[in-house]
Amino acid sequence: PEGVRDVYGKECAQKLELNQRLHQVLLNYGYEDIETPTFEYFEVFSQKVGTIPSKDLYKFFDREGNTLVLRPDVTPSIARCVAKYFSEEKVGIRLCYAGNVYLNNSSYQQKLKETCQLGAELVNDDSAQADSEIIAMAVDCFLTSGLHDFRISIGEVEFFQGLTASIEDDEIKNQLREFILNKNYFGLMEYVENLDIPENIKQVFLRFSELNGDVAILDQAEEMVDNKISKKAIARLRKVYEILKLYGKEKYVGFDLGMLNRHNYYTGIIFKGYTYGTGDAVLKGGRYDNLIEQFGKKAPSVGFAIVLDELMTALQRQEIPMEAESV
């Protein structure tokens, strides 16, 4: 079928070896393995949880008529697990996984609908230190794969929330969000010009495309906003950057305050990892402080997932040998 492929021979061996090396990075950071089912009840990935639109899920029924779904994303499954098996835990829980995910999305022409992801989740920790640990670990995964020319681009969901907090019309908020999600800044400028919103907020949206670059962007953004929520988001990014300097990873990161994610469960910092040779982000992650609560446990968390198939494509196109050195 369209969107799936066989992996065999040398490529299969390389994929297994790459998976093993990246897995070792996660273990070295003190993360423990977790496995969740390939399919779950539909409710685990419902719109209420904030994952993938229902039309993009592979759905089927069991004998009792329950709707089941091939997982499009591992994080909600882990959230369900944590609420069930770690309900009394108060200290940080470090979990890592590898597994296939499935997206039935027609816009993914020429893209795989079944991909292999490797990732990690740090649960029960709402600190900037947790955000930094996850990003530093993501950098180490890239370095261990053999990549050196890459960038982790970091944003903050609350920056956008602060800007739109005073806008009462949900339709306007959704339209602004859609323009920014698609990086359609010309469309955004045209749309904002005709909106009846405060002039200072309008000016930020008109200059949204500029809010992408190195750490100096944070100073520029702070001068542009005057609401507490956006300013707090910028302060959080600064703190994360300072901690990443202690890890020695700051040269691999940049900032994009125009970054949003289609997964609505993200609540704070979000980030994506880019390199040459692949059209999409190889790595995606962020903070989701309310997701596990949907399953019955209040547990602020942060995590990421690497799309192994995309990473292998990038390594091949950059002619990086799969047997790369460790960090």
Question: Where are these predicted regions, by residue range?
Answer:
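Hydrophobic mid-domain F-helix/FG-region of cytochrome P450s
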Residues: 137-144, 158-168
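TRNA-binding/sensing appendages of the translation machinery
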Residues: 1-76, 132, 153
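Short, surface-exposed recognition loops or helix-turn segments adjacent to catalytic cores
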Residues: 149-160, 254-258
